[in-house]
Amino acid sequence: MQKQGAGLDLIAVSHDYGRRRAVDSVSFQVAPGEILGLLGPSGCGKSTTLRLAAGLEDLQSGEVKIGGDVVAGGRVNIPTERRHVGMVFQDHALFPHISVAQNIAFGLGGVSAAEREARIGLWAGRLGLTRLLPAYPHQLSGGEQQRVALARAMAPEPRVMLLDEPFSSLDSRLRDQIRDETVDVLKLAGTATLLVTHDPEEAMRMSDRIAIMQAGRIEQIDTPAQVYAAPATPFVARFLSETNELPVKVAGGAVDTPFGRLPAPARMPDGSAALLMFRPEALQERAAGQGATAFTVERAMALGAYRRLEVSAAGQRFAARLPAGPLPPSGAVLHFGLNPDFCFVFPAA
């Protein structure tokens, strides 16, 4: 029986490929019913971390627990098929020579025929696949194939679900729909889920918490709102969205900027070099004379629900993100203030 409160637990997990450290002392927990997004660029170690959790790579250092039980670490190495994990990958990996129903039933060899049929019907119904049960994978759309892969992974009632870039092959509108359906299914089942992705929007849309990974290490783990509003490092700030950056100096517990003074973190001594980073939405249009700075519009783009402007002042160029509206012409002068809620000051590298 699964221990109460236990889902997936990685403790000081490390892994080397030859002389290259791919995963470096990674630790995190995923509770039942929680979706943890493991977010980072290609080659950062996130897929290796998932494979270590699944048992697809032999653990070299650390410990992996599933449902409160050690499945890897020390002398323990439980094979993948006995770890009670479901997995969905980018290519779906459906069996082309058998039907949708048979694909969903693939992992149900240990249950009775009646239970097998019940689970096929349950997951086909939840994912809108009932009418497609007799069909074969080549007869399905990309979204339908993704739903079959998810149904097959969920039918054995896994303790942990592992998703490795599962939506990247879908077009954008369908991708959003399948993401939302997947979250609904995982929450309904109460399954601890690790989602590996390089897409910040996907991680923020689907995850309860996000672990941001770089060069084999976790840089920050927190809620989507918190990692966006209070990034722990410049890498986290840059990876989540576009940033504007200015070199500044700390003086009197603050930094001077073209927009006025902003508070510096208490740990940064006076005279130290610092980096000011702020998101495009930190630039907020104001009337002249209200503590605002004049900027010249270099370029303006309509991007649906918002406008992206490139503006300049004192030889420096910045990106601004404003609500949808008329586009100002190049050369127009606009006045902006800076919202400190979207500003971050870090020690200079």
Indicate residue ranges for each PLM-predicted region.
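Conserved A-loop
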Residues: 15, 27-30
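ABC ATPase nucleotide-binding domains
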Residues: 35, 84-86, 90, 94-235
